[in-house]
Regions:
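Hydrophobic, proline/glycine-rich low-complexity stretches
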Residues: 8-10, 26, 78, 111
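Polyanion-engaging groove/track-forming segments
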Residues: 11-12, 115
């Protein structure tokens, strides 16, 4: 599944399903998931629920951080209702943690000094619900990227410390099976 901003259709958030055969790929029909301008789209797959989760900035709603669950059927995709995970401008990087079956969305929170922040969510049916956001970096950050490391069973977040000489920085964290809090937050290791 490829999610993108369609500049040819009012910058609407759009997704399309691709099917790989050998070294070729073919696509179904594009589907609009957000009928407003979007940006910073990030997609991950929840293998437990067999759903796609798309996180994005919704320019039609003050660039709020928003997520939506997609269900793939054949070469088509349908969507549930979009959910705001951050009521401020937030450029997301979405990953899936199979050990806790949670979606992790990392972002710089414009509503809180651009601090590095994580929203942890769980998919149920065609919807997603989020715990309270957790701040992992009390410094202004930007250009956040994230990936899940299977061997470490942890998420690695890379970002630029715009509030500290623009240093490239990485942070490693693990979700607890319950809500992420200062008590069960495991291991910050930073580089930069």
């Amino acid at each position: 599944v490829i999610a993108y901003r369609d500049d040819g259709n009012s910058y609407y958030g759009t997704a399309i399903v691709g099917t790989v055969s050998g070294t070729n790929i073919s696509f179904g029909s594009a589907v609009v998931f957000e009928s407003a301008s979007t940006s910073s789209t990030s997609t991950t797959f929840d293998s437990n629920s067999n759903k796609v989760v798309i996180a994005y900035q919704d320019a039609g709603n003050s660039n709020y951080g928003t997520a939506i669950v997609g269900t793939v059927s054949g070469t088509g995709i349908s969507f549930g209702t979009a959910v705001v995970f951050e009521s401020a401008s937030a450029a997301p990087a979405a990953t899936y943690d199979p050990t806790t079956q949670k979606i992790n969305i990392s972002y710089d929170d414009a509503g809180n000094s651009n601090y590095g922040t994580i929203a942890t969510g769980a998919v149920s049916g065609t919807s997603i619900s989020f715990d309270a956001p957790f701040v992992y970096a009390t410094v202004a950050s930007a250009l956040t990227r994230a990936v899940y490391n299977d061997s470490a069973q942890a998420v690695v977040v890379a970002y630029v410390k715009t509030g500290s000489s623009n240093h490239g920085t990485s942070t490693v964290y693990k979700n607890a099976s319950t809500n992420l809090t200062s008590e069960n937050y495991i291991g910050i290791a930073s580089n930069g």
